[in-house]
């Protein structure tokens, strides 16, 4: 047993300068586990609710109430628990909150405790977190889905699509994939400078130039891939996160200033897929446009990965609905959307059992916490989205994956092209 002896929490800052919750758990053998909770800018309406103070401090975004929930309400209930009983502990946290969306205690309070307990238990067992959570079969290093051009809610620009990403599918190892991404990222900066475009960074480390339209972003990325010495679609593919809920108004999608129906937007995506080496479309339609999603999946699901983020919010009930109604073929996994470690693992397992792919994801407001890197390997997810190879809160996750690959040594496998149906020759699920 590794008995929980004490729990503490504090208010710290995330990468956007907003407060977030950090939790420390002390075990009876002296082991300390620490975890910090991320926060999103583009959030789904059905996510677990983070608790904010709503007072004059930090523009209402303080988290003293969540910190107090940890120390005054959660700690007395779980001190004395065996930290290795993660599922029992997480169930107790859910029961203690008593709401369907964790709004009483706050998902930021609950997740902070859940993550810190997992880390403490892993350290107490002298196991890396990925091995503790994933067992002996955890071995697959994920393709880094690098957001190198930002638009939408992540940048002050006139590009509607929120993220333009690169996927180094042709690399043999994660370390090599990271190099592919970094070299392309630097090449993109040179391309932007050469065009007289801004090279300021968005929330997730990607560049945020003012561009005329969304296709220009893809064209610039393809140019950068070539400039870096790589082959588009062979060495490096591209992907987008449209975050379509953000430009959905009164039953229409306002894209590039034009209102479009779901059917018209689907045709737009079909044209993009035909024109570019796209392997993944995330949130291409709004979070409640289930009919549109079904049409899109029927049209493109056999060709490219269609990732549900806002529509699924890492919630097993919504994921199950998607599986039953043939919506999407992949799930974005964010720990703070659901609020505990075990619920996150359950969501991944549910997706994999149904043949859906999974992508473990950061949030736009991040910290130096590297839990998601370990979760990506623990679950053999095959993909991770944690921003550009810039800004230390993003790079921390990549560096952790380098360490994990080194530790796995000959057992390590890089997901590579096999993670995506378009160029792997497999079905999309």
Curated annotation (Swiss-Prot):
A Gene Ontology term for the protein's cellular component:
extracellular region
Question: Main site of residence?
Answer: cytoplasm
EC no.?
4.2.1.11
Kindly list the places in or outside the cell where this protein is found, as annotated in its UniProt entry.
Answer: Cytoplasm; Secreted; Cell surface
A GO molecular function annotation here is:
magnesium ion binding
To which protein family does this belong? Belongs to the enolase family.
Which purpose does this protein serve, as stated in its record?
Answer: Catalyzes the reversible conversion of 2-phosphoglycerate (2-PG) into phosphoenolpyruvate (PEP). It is essential for the degradation of carbohydrates via glycolysis.
Descriptive protein name: Enolase
Q: Which organism is it from?
A: Acidothermus cellulolyticus (strain ATCC 43068 / DSM 8971 / 11B)
